[in-house]
Amino acid sequence: MTKATPRRRRWRIGELAGATGVTVRTLHHYEHTGLLAASERTDGGHRMYDRESIQRVHQIRALRELGFSLQEIRRAMDGRTSLTDLLRKHLQRIEVQVARATQLRDRLRNMTTDGDVRVSVDQLPAALDAMSKVEKRPQPRPCTCALAADREERWRRIRNDLRHCMDRNEHPCSDRTKAVALEARTLISEIAGNDLTGSTILKVLARLSDPRSLAGWDPHLMQYLDSALVALGDQPH
């Protein structure tokens, strides 16, 4: 006597949700987008799913966790798109997102690491806008060692001259102090462009510059230069 072939197990949609860790609503959405189909229906019209359905849901979840859209997942699972090509394109998107996240991290770090600088809500848009302008500027060709060394030397000289003015209690509006500030503004413009002014320039420059070139630039000296730059006003470069 031939034994009856055992009936393959089937799961109702609620059971499938419990077995795969997704909600019934999500499974309905997968069906609506063509990602999932019931293996059969009961006489009462209830959807039933098999082991292949469970495997497919796990595959969909894995691709979703990688950040793919449902449309991309459907093309890959239907064989219309190479999964390898899809992964490569997704990797490019992730790299862009990582770069943006890194910029955001640096902005937040720049605005919070200096305990002597208080960023108010009113200053926040200007600070973020200034940083964004610097980030969006076309990247210059790498400067030669001679040019880099010259800028570092000029920056050190400006720092020393400005420190001398401050130690002598010269007012930031004095001719000597403004002359040094003008040299500083010229150098800052070479690095950050002419569209940034005042204290925002200093905050951005202080964060973007090589820390070694900022040795000796304590908050008091930076504030002194800030005041001198304000005193320059619209004086031509």
Curated annotation (Swiss-Prot):
Keywords: DNA-binding, Nitrogen fixation, Nodulation
Domain HTH merR-type: 10-79
Record protein name field: Nodulation protein NolA
GO MF term (any one): DNA-binding transcription factor activity
Main function: Involved in genotype-specific nodulation of soybeans.
InterPro entries associated with the record: DNA-bd_dom_put_sf, MerR-type_HTH_dom, MerR_fam
One Pfam family of this chain: MerR_1
Endpoints of the signal sequence: none
SUPFAM superfamilies: Putative DNA-binding domain
DNA-binding region, residue intervals: 13-32
PANTHER family per the UniProt record, alphabetical: HTH-TYPE TRANSCRIPTIONAL ACTIVATOR MTA, REDOX-CYCLING DRUG-SENSING TRANSCRIPTIONAL ACTIVATOR SOXR
GO biological process: nitrogen fixation
Upper lineage: Bacteria, Pseudomonadati, Pseudomonadota, Alphaproteobacteria, Hyphomicrobiales
Annotated CDD domains: HTH_NolA-AlbR (cd04788)
Originating species: Bradyrhizobium sp. (strain NC92)
